[in-house]
């Protein structure tokens, strides 16, 4: 898949992360009783980046968890006969906490629906909010993010690629055309 355009470079990503962190602090009137949970895979480094920015502003650490939604997806049978399970790691109680789910791209809303199902199996949060780096539209479910790094209108024939240093060795967001015969 060849990138046809870079829509965010590292500086733009960091500005968006900083803004999201400030918006989270403002909306929640601080960070007491707050936790971030990154959706595997690229939501995890984003959650860590947001937590670092929050710590820099508030002087308090916010717990960060990892949520694997693989077994909660409604397209599991289409993914693979043997899906790769990365594992959920939430080392703190989520019951009665304000949880901010973090993901890289919001598209149809199905990933977030699966994440909410997985989260509810882990406890009963006081509130669940959603932070995404990219909102590309095309929702199939009534899901709306609370915090957005950038709105990027796309066609269904395009794919948004978020590349993060922790996984990809570079921080940027690009758009590519979907290859014929490949379903995204």
Swiss-Prot record:
Gene3D superfamilies: 3.40.50.2020
Alphabetical keyword list: Glycosyltransferase, RNA-binding, Transcription, Transcription regulation, Transcription termination, Transferase
Keyword Cell membrane applies: no
UniProt catalytic activity: UMP + diphosphate = 5-phospho-alpha-D-ribose 1-diphosphate + uracil
GO process annotations (BP): DNA-templated transcription termination
Keyword RNA-binding assigned: yes
Physiological role: Regulates transcriptional attenuation of the pyrimidine nucleotide (pyr) operon by binding in a uridine-dependent manner to specific sites on pyr mRNA. This disrupts an antiterminator hairpin in the RNA and favors formation of a downstream transcription terminator, leading to a reduced expression of downstream genes.
Protein name (record): Bifunctional protein PyrR
Gene field: pyrR
């Amino acid at each position: 898949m060849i990138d046809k355009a870079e829509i965010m470079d590292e500086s733009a990503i960091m500005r968006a992360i900083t803004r999201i962190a400030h918006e989270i602090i403002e909306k929640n009137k601080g960070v007491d009783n707050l936790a971030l949970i990154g959706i595997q895979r690229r939501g995890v480094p984003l959650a860590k980046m947001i937590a670092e920015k929050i710590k820099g502003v508030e002087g308090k650490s916010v717990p960060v968890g990892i949520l694997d939604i693989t077994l909660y997806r409604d397209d599991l049978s289409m993914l693979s006969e043997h899906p790769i399970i990365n594992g959920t790691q939430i080392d703190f109680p989520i019951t009665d906490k304000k949880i901010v789910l973090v993901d890289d791209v919001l598209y149809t809303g199905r990933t977030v629906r699966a994440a909410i199902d997985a989260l509810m199996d882990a406890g009963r949060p006081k509130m669940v909010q959603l932070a995404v780096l990219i909102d590309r539209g095309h929702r199939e479910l009534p899901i709306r993010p609370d915090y957005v790094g950038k709105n990027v209108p796309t066609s269904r024939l395009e794919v948004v690629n978020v590349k993060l240093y922790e996984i990809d060795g570079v921080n940027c967001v690009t758009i590519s055309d979907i290859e014929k015969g490949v379903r995204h």
